[in-house]
Structures are given as C-alpha cells and as structure tokens.
C-alpha cells in the first residue's frame, strides 16, 4: 500500500513505503555555527536511511553599500566555498555524495527559494542562526524558514 502525504493540493511531500515517509531530496543549509555542525550527523543518518540526494547550501548575505563581509559580520564568498568543501569532505568520508549550492541573498528567503527549485522533500537545520530582517531586527533564520518553507523543516537542537 502506498500513501501520499501532501504539502499542498498539487505537490506531494514524499511517498510512503510501508508506513515510512521517504525523503528523496534533503536540503541542508549550513553556516559555521555549532548548531549546523550538530545537525550534520542527523542529516547523514537521514540520507542513509532514505537513500536521499543531499544538497548542501550556504548563503552569503548581501552587504549594505560600503560595507565588506567582515564589517557586516557575514562570510565572504571564499569562506563559504571553503565551508562547502569541508562539509562535502565530511559527508564523502561517510560514503554520501553531495551537491553544493552557494547563493547570495537573505538567508531565510534564499533557503526557501532553493528548496523550491530543487524540489526538496525536507530541509534540515540547526536550531539557531540569527540574521537581520529587513527591519533590522534580529530574528532566527530557522524560525523564518519554518514559516516560509515549501516543504517540512526538521530543526535539530
């Protein structure tokens, strides 16, 4: 028996196989936070269990005019590339192939846009990751992704 779970009337989350929802594509947005490192093992376990495609995403936030990445507190494109390479190596050691994506933009919106583009069945994130909203107020990127995501979000404490 196959059960479909629905994220909207037109788009399935994943197929159920014997009562277990299958995640074909898992998106793992990462940064240099401890929470992202802690979530990595959960991601590896899920990918192995579901034989999923793993997509690693890192977002370089746009800087206000006249500020460099260091002054704004965000990673440079070079640092993000190194982060993705290091993460790819960690997953490779566990026999997990990955695809990497690097984007520029507001983290929460970019994560949701990429999830939609790659037809992700699941986003896995650490529980903290602060970014500034357009109003300049600190808000959790994770909380915003939960509210905007086109697919389920697993938050790892």
UniProtKB/Swiss-Prot annotation:
A Pfam family per the record: Usp
Name of the protein this chain belongs to: Universal stress protein Sll1654
Disulphide connectivity of cysteines: none
InterPro entries named in the record: Rossmann-like_a/b/a_fold, Universal_stress_UspA, UspA
Family assignment from sequence similarity: Belongs to the universal stress protein A family.
Gene3D superfamilies cross-referenced by the UniProt entry: HUPs (3.40.50.620)
Species per Swiss-Prot/TrEMBL record: Synechocystis sp. (strain ATCC 27184 / PCC 6803 / Kazusa)
